[in-house]
Amino acid sequence: MRVLDASMALAWLFPRKDAAEVALAEQALDELDYEEFLVPSIWYGEVANAILRGERKGLVTASQTAAFLAELDLADIETEADSPKLRQSVVLALARVHSLTAYDATYLELALRRGAPLATFDQKLAEATREAGGRVFGDRP
């Protein structure tokens, strides 16, 4: 199992410039065939918002977006079942300790609670994950 943040998934639509990041995004995409990816409920809004920004900037078309979303629908991406309300105090504490947004701390909390690596390109979130004792997808053991 992996916790997937929006930045990693969006790299499948908006390719990264760094070769190592491109390879990591491709590895995560390949793992969708046999590995479960877990997301918090906020993931869908974050992905939709980034897609809209990309469309408005002319980086992607609505038809490219539709194809991307159809592929995501086929992927083994599960939404965390617990209510965000149950985790709010932990998310706030993690956000305060690591100077994260509540959104990013939501991913961190989920990865720590599930003991799963966090797949992210957000360097601040990745560092907070390591500091909190979690694992980041792509890090060597």
Language-model regions: role of each:
Residues M1-I42, G54-A66, A132:
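Short, well-structured N-terminal submotif of metal-dependent ribonuclease cores
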Residues M8-A9, W43, L86, Y107, ...:
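Alpha-helix capping/helix-boundary segments
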Residues S41-Y44, Q64-V97, E109:
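Acidic catalytic patch
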